[in-house]
């Protein structure tokens, strides 16, 4: 990660939306980090799109107005959700994977990349997961490993400058882990209590 954060600085999060994105993949971290910010944890959260600002149609038909194009140079954390992985011709992650210009820009991003579910496959296509511990949705694990990642069977995998989450609902655990990692376990527990949610699975951390 190419930045040094003072404790007084807000953690600037951008969540990338695109046509075909899985609703749960991005809603969970937006909810968790937005709540953390309101509780004084120092997170700011922004929805962004790789194209011009406008309406994104999600996997299950939800339409979201995204007011911002992505500006990764202004982010400390870039969250890439998944969606549409099983349909290689429709909207979803495969359109991002096919966009070589986007992948080149993504590969050069200095913000901490965070992949949720099959959004990890977008990071993989950009070469970010190659040779590194990572996880993804169960249906994509074999391909992730074939593309050079070191597959870890954990809910959240934190390799310091790369974080990945496995499964559609893993965005909850990933986001709560981000709160814990950046502002402490006590603050993460406060958010968890307000959400009335109990984290599941394990967090694997590189030594």
Per-segment meaning from a language model:
Residues 154-164, 168:
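Amphipathic alpha-helical segments enriched in hydrophobic/aromatic residues interleaved with Lys/Arg
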Residues 130-138, 151-154:
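Short hydrophobic/aromatic-enriched beta-strand-loop microsegments
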Residues 17, 136, 166:
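Small/polar loops that bind or transfer phosphate-bearing groups
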Residues 1-113, 121-125, 141-145, 150-153, ...:
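Extended, subdomain-level signal for the structured scaffold at the beginning of enzyme domains
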Residues 79, 135, 157:
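Conserved beta-strand segments that form the floor/walls of ligand-binding pockets within enzyme
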Residues 113-114, 135, 152, 163:
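Structural detector of well-ordered beta-strand residues that form the stable sheet scaffold
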């Amino acid at each position: 990660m190419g930045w040094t954060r003072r404790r007084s600085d807000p953690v600037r999060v951008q969540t990338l939306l695109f046509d075909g994105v899985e609703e749960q993949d991005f809603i969970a971290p937006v909810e968790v980090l937005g709540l953390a910010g309101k509780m004084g944890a120092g997170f700011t959260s922004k929805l962004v799109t790789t194209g011009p600002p406008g309406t994104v149609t999600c996997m299950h038909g939800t339409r979201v107005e995204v007011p911002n194009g992505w500006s990764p140079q202004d982010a400390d954390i870039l969250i890439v959700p998944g969606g549409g992985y099983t349909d290689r011709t429709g909207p979803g992650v495969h359109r991002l994977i096919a966009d070589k210009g986007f992948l080149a820009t993504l590969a050069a991003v200095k913000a901490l990349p965070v992949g949720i579910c099959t959004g990890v496959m977008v990071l993989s296509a950009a070469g970010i997961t190659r040779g590194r511990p990572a996880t993804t949705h169960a249906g994509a694990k074999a391909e992730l490993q074939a593309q050079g990642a070191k597959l870890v069977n954990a809910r959240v995998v934190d390799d310091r400058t790369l974080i990945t989450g496995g499964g559609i609902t893993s965005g909850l655990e990933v986001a709560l882990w981000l709160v814990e990692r950046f502002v402490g376990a006590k603050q993460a527990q406060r958010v968890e209590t307000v959400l009335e949610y109990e984290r599941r699975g394990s967090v694997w951390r590189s030594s």
